[in-house]
């Protein structure tokens, strides 16, 4: 991983939520690095706010897909529950952390977001990289319908685009709006194509995917 602890208290703060025996996993806040543009910085703040919270199955109607969000860029798991539920799935192109978190939520456990635990982590993806990354996201949603099909994920993406647009207008960063539109378009197109990858030619799927090694016969057995 390319995440860097923001301070020396990362592990200590990541473990604090386990004082609640119902918490089965906890994940840290991600802060954009110095080379990030303001859109990436806003995205990190949107996905990783300063306020802590604990999610349970009761939050599904309100939070939707975000209930299952638990980025393993920097996360911890209660070992006995992790093993009891079988650990990370062995066959997935992407999203093993969210699939694990969904299993925990559905089993009645809770997921904690601990923003006091901080790591520096962000990426500057090109339009093509945004497309391929979200293609793989769509593939994972297709392959695990029991986890993802019952909850719409597009609404959260639309909310992010709207909030980012409002932010850019407020900051008078009008020249960045076309970039936001293009980035969002490539993300959405990639996701929708990945969601329907099984009706596409295999050679085309390989070209669209970021994680090309996943499509080797050995990895898919």
Question: In which residue ranges do the predicted regions lie?
Answer:
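Juxtamembrane C-terminal module of membrane proteins
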Residues: 156, 160, 190-221
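Short acidic donor-binding/metal-coordinating loop in glycosyltransferase active sites
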Residues: 1-3, 96
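Short, flexible, basic/aromatic active-site loop/helix in glycosyltransferases
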Residues: 28-32, 46-67
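A recurrent flexible, glycine/aromatic-enriched loop bordering the glycosyltransferase active site
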Residues: 56-77, 93, 99, 141, ...
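A short, conserved alpha-helix in the catalytic core of glycosyltransferases
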Residues: 75-77, 81-86, 91-118
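Active-site-adjacent helix/loop segment of glycosyltransferases
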Residues: 111-190
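Conserved donor NDP-sugar-binding/catalytic core segment of glycosyltransferases
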Residues: 3-41
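Alpha-helical elements of Rossmann-like donor-binding domains used by nucleotide-donor carbohydrate transfer enzymes
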Residues: 9-13, 99-103, 133, 163, ...
